[in-house]
């Protein structure tokens, strides 16, 4: 029996979600390029499921882009490129002439936002990236976390991880941050809340294990997870 797609899963659970009185719990993790956002998400998933006897927590990262790729018959690379792209009259005109089935950036971002909101409302979700904080800014019973670090620290980490020199690592950071600039502006407009995140950590000072411990304490104090058993 084929495993249901994320879209099918969400559709199948819409009735259950509509009956749910309270959203969450959920956690969103935003990160600067070069920080341990993905690794932190994996570690948090492990720690959260240690607190949950039913091990209901799941992590969502590239799964959303993968699902949209499967739904549209496109590659994840095309979906990601369009998600980051700015509106273009010429591109939209050509898209209309070709009757292109490729969704534009606006459609892709809206679909991802809907997925994120649905997942967060259903609860027991660790959402890494994908504009999670902006998409869930008005949904209760969640915590939004941001991981940052000085540029030099991120350059050193990328240099080691990718086995490249620091100049190349710096160029990678510039390229990624330039691509994300437009997306970040849209997220700021979508979520004008100040501060934008519940917690912000300096990854150069706190390791992922230390950050996770602080997040667990915060989630416990907010009633999102049960106290640790003694």
What are these language model-derived features?
Residues 1-102, 110, 114, 118-124, ...:
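Glycine-rich phosphate-binding loop of ATP-dependent small-molecule kinases
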Residues 60, 146, 203-204:
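Small/polar loops that bind or transfer phosphate-bearing groups
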Residues 125-129:
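Structural recognition of the conserved hydrophobic beta-strand(s) that form the central parallel beta-sheet
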Residues 138-162, 166-174:
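Conserved phosphate-donor/acceptor-positioning beta-strand/loop module used by diverse small-molecule
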Residues 207-211, 215-216:
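Alpha-helical transmembrane segments and their cytosolic interface
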């Amino acid at each position: 029996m084929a495993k249901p797609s994320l879209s099918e899963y969400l559709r199948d659970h819409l009735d259950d979600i509509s009956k749910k009185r309270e959203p969450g719990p959920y956690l969103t993790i935003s990160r600067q390029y070069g920080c341990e956002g993905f690794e932190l998400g994996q570690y948090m998933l492990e720690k959260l499921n240690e607190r949950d006897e039913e091990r209901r927590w799941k992590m969502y990262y590239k799964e959303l882009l993968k699902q949209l790729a499967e739904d549209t018959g496109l590659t994840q690379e095309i979906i990601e490129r369009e998600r980051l792209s700015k509106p273009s009259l010429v591109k939209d005109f050509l898209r209309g002439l070709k009757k292109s089935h490729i969704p534009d950036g606006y459609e892709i971002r809206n679909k991802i936002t809907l997925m994120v909101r649905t997942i967060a409302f259903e609860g027991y979700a660790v959402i890494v990236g994908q504009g999670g904080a902006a998409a869930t800014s008005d949904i209760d019973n969640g915590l939004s976390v941001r991981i940052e670090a000085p540029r030099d620290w991120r350059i050193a980490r990328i240099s080691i991880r990718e086995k490249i020199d620091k100049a190349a690592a710096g160029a990678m950071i510039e390229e990624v941050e330039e691509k994300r600039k437009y997306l970040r502006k849209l997220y700021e407009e979508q979520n004008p809340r100040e501060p934008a995140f519940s917690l912000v950590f300096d990854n150069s000072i706190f390791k992922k294990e230390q950050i996770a411990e602080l997040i667990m304490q915060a989630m416990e104090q907010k009633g999102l997870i049960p106290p640790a058993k003694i």
